[in-house]
Amino acid sequence: TLRGPTEDGAASVRLSDAIYETFRLQAIHIPAAAPHPTKLVQSAAMASVAPPKPTYRPKLPVAVLHDGMLSDAQLETVIYAGDAHGAYLAGSWTVDETGDMVSAAPDDAADAVRFRRGFFLGDGTGAGKGRQSAGIVLDNWAQGRRKALWISKSDKLLEDAQRDWSALGQERLLVTPLSRFAQGKDIPLTEGIL
């Protein structure tokens, strides 16, 4: 459900002299969503600006919402990421055989491709970025986009990615380490999370 302005037309956000404000969903309301298990804050400047109203509705297993596998704040992230992933970047492109060279191409070129828009997740400690990332991948997965790259600082975070994916009711072994494949060789997976 989208949230609207107050009756007098003003946004329902109040300014204060605090540096941080308690985080709350501003543009949407997600009925039956669990509150985030820890207190989240945002800068007062961020809290004073209402985010855009998304038009996207995620495709997630019912249990994700009803069993509280993702909190309201984490679901908001999935919604905004889905809003971005539902559109393409401007222009058309050609990609060479190696995948190393991308060049602008006319829209009607026979071998032209388009690229989906991305989404940057910059939440701080305690927001559950791994769980949010798993939710974003799961939403794409449910729509048939079954190839994902999960990039982490080190391979030691593989178990964290597998934990977050399986916490959403998914098979943890679908998160496959890149080290399982020889460098410079094709990766034969037809679907999965690398």
Q: Could you tell me what each predicted segment is?
A:
Residues L2-Y20, P35-M69, V95-A110, R116-R117, ...:
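SF2 helicase/translocase NTPase motor core
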Residues Y20-Q26:
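Eukaryotic nuclear, charge-biased low-complexity tracts
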Residues D72-L75:
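Carboxylate-rich, divalent-cation-coordinating active-site regions
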Residues G82, G86, G130, L138:
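Residue-level marker of positions within ordered structural domains that often coincide
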Residues D83, G126, D155-L158:
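Short, solvent-exposed loop/turn segments at secondary-structure junctions
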Residues D83-A90, A109-G118:
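Phosphate-binding P-loop
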Residues R114-I136:
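Walker A/P-loop
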